[in-house]
Amino acid sequence: GGNSNVCIGDEAGRSLTTGDNNIAIGHEALYSENAHGQNIAIGYRALKAQDGGAEVQNTAIGYLAGQAIDLGRENVLVGGNAGDALTHADYNVAIGNGSLGADTLGHKSTAVGYATLNAQNFTSSTDSNNTAVGYFAGVAVTTGVNNTLIGSLAGDALTEGGNNTALGIRSLGADTLGSRNTAIGYNTLLVQNFASATNSYNVAMGHDAGRAITTGIFNTLIGSLAGDALSDADTNVAIGASALTTDTLGSKSTAVGHSALEAQNFASATTTHNTAVGADSGKAISTGTTNSTFGSSSGAALTTGTHNVLIGSYAGAGGVGNLTTGLRNILIGHGAGQNNGNDNGNIAIGYETNCQGHAEAIVLGGNVDSVANTTFTFGRNDGSDRVHNNYTSNATFTRVSDERYKKEIQNNTDCGLDFINELRTVTFKFKAKSEIPNTLPDYDASKTTADHTGKLYGMIAQEVKAAMATHNITDFGGHSEEESSGIQGVAQSMFIYPLIKAVQELSAQVTALTARVTELEG
């Protein structure tokens, strides 16, 4: 025994007897070891106290590096005073002057940089699983575990906080007792600090993301300046550069996209329930709440409006009457409601549909405007392709019938009394889906009861079609037939015009008969 050892310096490797393959360079380096090998001790009193009970394979380079280790194994300690208090500690890496300088019984720590994990100290055998890389990274950690701190001053105030990840200069730089945080980027979660042990679950990624959070919890902030003004605010999500960048005390906001909810700011603790998804979505909202905006620049002009739903790029924005303070509007489609102004309770669905100057209106179609308050309008474009009704009065639909939109105007001569007399009105009940022919798309053998079981009044579409053929009537909107299934239908309102013609014909007959009776009685 005692082979292949290199010992250079006063008292270096003094106690070695049977240990092999050791290197001891420096005054009292590897002083106490006698029987074990594969150790490297370079520096004044490096590994001086080691006398392990197995092949310990420690490496200590630097003044007093690992000087107190006795039974610890597989440690790598490089730098003046690196790991100089460790005793029964295993699997540690300390590189840098003063790194891991106070711990005695902690295991599995990695400290790289000047004074990293300098205050860590476990009084009983503990797997710390702490990693600190960078000048003063984790310098104040005492008994916190499972921390990963990378960057100068990263997590430099942490003491007992655990399960944190801080990557970037000064990231998580003030917190002492917070746990389960993730801070990635320069100044992320810079001033967060909990006075008592707290699982805050904050995530901040990006330059200055979440830099002003103090005691807020459950926030997810990803992107440069994302949520960078939030302080005591909770359960926010901001993803995108400058998303939710102004707010301080608003909670339960979701901003996804560049500058989404950029201007939102509440001076007192407020549950906002705002959701903005898309670049510049909801970017002007200041104190409006419970808004949902989806699409690039959707709701981009909205400020104090509440309870609005906007879906589609430039929905409620991009026009001459942007939605700013309106309430309870639903705008769906590119540019839908972009001229809505500050009106309330409107529903606009379709490309550039609008309710400008109106309230409680419903618009459906493309590039079509409402005609008045409390109306339902549908169609495409304005003019002859637009149909509307006023559902607070007669609830009937109105379509443009202006003579200026019409040509080839002729008297109706074929769709009158004779046609009406050909029709049969009936009473009936609808069949269950299992009773109709199985060739029809609605057939369902399991549906043995009709959706509506009461008696109804109406006509038979096939009979209407036959009457039309008898009187050579074409292009009559009162009858329709689906091309794919052959299912026929009747539009009851279209029979008003044949009925008017029939009444006129009857009136003429009555007039003639009255004249005849008068003549006969005279």
Where in the sequence are the language-model features?
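Short, surface-exposed loop/helix-turn segments at secondary-structure junctions
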Residues: 439-451
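Glycine- and aromatic-enriched periplasmic loops at the membrane-periplasm interface
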Residues: 433-442, 461-462
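Glycine- and small/polar-enriched repetitive beta-structure motifs of secreted/surface proteins
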Residues: 1-401
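Glycine-rich, acidic and aromatic/proline-enriched surface loops and short helix-turn segments
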Residues: 422-425, 461-474
